[in-house]
């Protein structure tokens, strides 16, 4: 049905899928992905639910599909784009996070050897803006950074959370705003001391995660020179 007037978007959401090993059988994996629809209200796509599939890997690099398109967690709400996962403190299981747009809640899901378990909607003590963005988890799993490009606003609002990998809980740590392009990504240093992000399609900034005011700690470490 593809034509000049109909475009096959596929899965159009940044950070909209993740693959995790099955904690009960390492020859299998879970694929977590979004169900998104074009939303004329905001001129882009909105995620209304998350789905799961499970695959069995073979030694010849082929795989079998065990199941697909199984919903989990809340449905018919408006999710922010990112879904992120961090390993449980037990070293085996996984916590999954997906934020609910324009609310004070995120969806918490546990993946253990018996499957995916909805742990409900959790209030991190912070209103989640009505926008879209990207997120990342630090290498050692201690922090989550998420940025929101607010509809009709040129600023990127960046929020930091401490992660309790035993309970899966997020605790608000700090936030700042940055004039930027739409949806820049984030990267942590291996030590988790520094966070990096870009602005205005030209500048690369470094932030000190140990600072009392993370936003005020920014240092320009790179600038686009046209190659």
Where are these predicted regions, by residue range?
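Beta-strand initiation motifs
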Residues: 1, 57-72, 112-123, 165-174, ...
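Extracellular distal adhesion/interaction modules in secreted or cell-surface proteins
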Residues: 1-10, 29, 34, 39-41, ...
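Short, solvent-exposed loop/turn segments at conserved positions within beta-propeller repeat blades
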Residues: 1-12, 39-48, 100-103, 151-156, ...
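Structural signature of eukaryotic scaffold interfaces centered on beta-propeller domains
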Residues: 8-28, 38, 74-93, 131-140, ...
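First exposed extracellular module after export/assembly in secreted or surface-exposed proteins
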Residues: 10-16, 23-30, 36, 47-51, ...
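Asp-box/WD-like beta-propeller blade repeats and closely related beta-sheet repeat scaffolds
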Residues: 34-101, 123-128
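Beta-propeller domains
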Residues: 89-207
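Conserved blade-ending motifs and adjacent loop-strand segments that build the rim/top face
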Residues: 176-187, 214-227
């Amino acid at each position: 049905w593809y034509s000049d007037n109909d475009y096959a978007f596929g899965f159009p959401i940044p950070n909209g899928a993740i693959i995790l090993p099955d904690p009960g059988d390492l020859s299998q994996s879970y694929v977590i992905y979004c169900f998104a629809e074009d939303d004329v209200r905001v001129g882009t796509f909105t995620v209304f639910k998350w789905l799961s599939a499970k695959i069995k890997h073979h030694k010849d690099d082929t795989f079998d599909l065990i199941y697909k398109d199984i919903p989990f967690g809340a449905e018919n709400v408006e999710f922010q784009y990112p879904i992120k996962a961090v390993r449980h403190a037990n070293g085996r299981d996984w916590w999954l996070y997906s934020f609910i747009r324009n609310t004070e809640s995120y969806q918490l899901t546990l993946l253990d050897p018996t499957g995916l378990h909805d742990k409900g909607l959790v209030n991190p003590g912070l209103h989640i803006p009505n926008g879209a963005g990207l997120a990342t988890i630090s290498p050692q799993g201690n922090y989550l950074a998420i940025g929101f490009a607010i509809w009709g606003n040129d600023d990127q609002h960046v929020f930091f959370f401490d992660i309790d990998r035993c309970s899966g809980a997020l605790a608000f740590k700090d936030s700042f705003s940055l004039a930027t392009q739409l949806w820049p990504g984030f990267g942590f240093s291996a030590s988790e001391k520094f966070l990096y992000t870009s602005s205005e399609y030209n500048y690369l900034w470094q932030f000190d995660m140990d600072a009392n005011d993370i936003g005020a700690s920014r240092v320009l470490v790179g600038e686009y020179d046209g190659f």
